[in-house]
Amino acid sequence: MNNLEIFKESEKYMPGGVNSPVRAFSNASINPPIIKKGLGSRIVDEEGKEYIDFVASWGPMILGHNDPEVVEAIQNTVEDAISFGAPTELELKLAKHMVETLDNIDMVRMVNSGTEATMSAIKLARGYTRRDRIIKFAGCYHGHFDGFLVEAGSGVLTERIPGSPGVPKGSIENTLIAEYNHIDTVEALFEKYPEEIAAIIIEPIAGNMGTIPAKTEFLQRLREICTKYGALLIFDEVMTGFRVAYKGAQSRYGVKPDLTTYAKIMGGGLPSGAYGGRRDIMEKLSPIGPVYQAGTMSGNPVVMAAGYTTLRKLYNNPSYYEHMEKIGAELQKGIEIVAKEKGLPVVVNRCGAMLTPFFSKRDKVADYEDAKSSDTELYGRFFEHMIKSGIYIAPSQFEAMFIGVKHDIYEVERFLEAMRKF
């Protein structure tokens, strides 16, 4: 079957033909290619068409598709283990590596996704502080947990859904919304609820309303406010962890969170997640503390092997980050030059190996309101043109593009060549 036939058949058995909404290309007039295989920075669909991949499975594939060392680790592990639901040495290896190589992580708990990591971190923060309210930021996406689906980014923003049916009012009544990069909105909430807020959760570099870095002074003030009021500061580094730097966004800003969540890259391409932080907080988790959180597949040996191999390879090769910074800078510069040549209203935000070209007439895109002003119709046409040109980018204006270790200058030139023909 060709791409269209497979997709139409899939629609009979899966809602929208997909298992995650953004994959359906519902905001575009083309159907998604059905991907068959990948190698390095390239993916190939069922019809044999090759694409330069700047989606990277929405971030995880930083080493490229089918990295030989990761594949070998997976193959060696499955010969002896697929799942036990019991302790293994592999989970110790990954946990120890993370604690020893990351800042601000004294202990870590493995889970199976970014959503699990963030919802578990919130539960832990509430249990530790004995408070119920949390603060999240408009446009930040922390997974599909009920309490987060308020003013969320990612697919919720792409689909223009104000929230989501099926989320009871009671699930979100303790979720307070502040404005990203606007500290006065945070201060006002703490003044109103000085002893009720358990935590602030934030993407230090937002990636789900497009790439929007937090201002350094903004994060510093969040740290000060949390310390003052006895609330916890949670950095959602599901996307930025091991990507914008090995030690994540917090290492670029020099701001210390109490808890950090991870996923995507840390699983080497397999379903993964983790949260960690201060020992006194993490020791509140069951079985040594009162906060209960569990998972049948948590610490799965195959995932642990892939994750351990990936993180060790990234940690032992700092030149990878130098390379991705170089490629990212060249791509950003090139997009800006071509946009100017063609009279396209484009603002490029980039932090290391993630970037977003916003089709916006504003001078800068620094917050949620700026992001929402983007010309999504124009971006949609650009997306369709690039896909047809063999450049695989996100169908949504509000998702990031990802640079990987295997991307090179030639692929930057291919991207820019395609853009010039738009």
From Swiss-Prot:
Pathway: Porphyrin-containing compound metabolism; protoporphyrin-IX biosynthesis; 5-aminolevulinate from L-glutamyl-tRNA(Glu): step 2/2. Its cofactor is pyridoxal 5'-phosphate. One of its GO terms (molecular function) is transaminase activity. InterPro entries: 4pyrrol_synth_GluAld_NH2Trfase, Aminotrans_3, Aminotrans_3_PPA_site, PyrdxlP-dep_Trfase, PyrdxlP-dep_Trfase_major, PyrdxlP-dep_Trfase_small. It catalyses: (S)-4-amino-5-oxopentanoate = 5-aminolevulinate. SUPFAM superfamilies: PLP-dependent transferases. Its EC number is 5.4.3.8. CDD domains: OAT_like (cd00610). It is an enzyme of class 5 (isomerase). Pfam families: Aminotran_3. Keywords: Cytoplasm, Isomerase, Porphyrin biosynthesis, Pyridoxal phosphate. It is found in: Cytoplasm. The modification N6-(pyridoxal phosphate)lysine is found at K264. The keyword Chaperone does not apply. Its main location: cytoplasm. The keyword Cytoplasm applies. GO terms for biological process: protoporphyrinogen IX biosynthetic process. GO terms for cellular component: cytoplasm. Homodimer. Belongs to the class-III pyridoxal-phosphate-dependent aminotransferase family. HemL subfamily. This is Glutamate-1-semialdehyde 2,1-aminomutase. The gene is hemL.
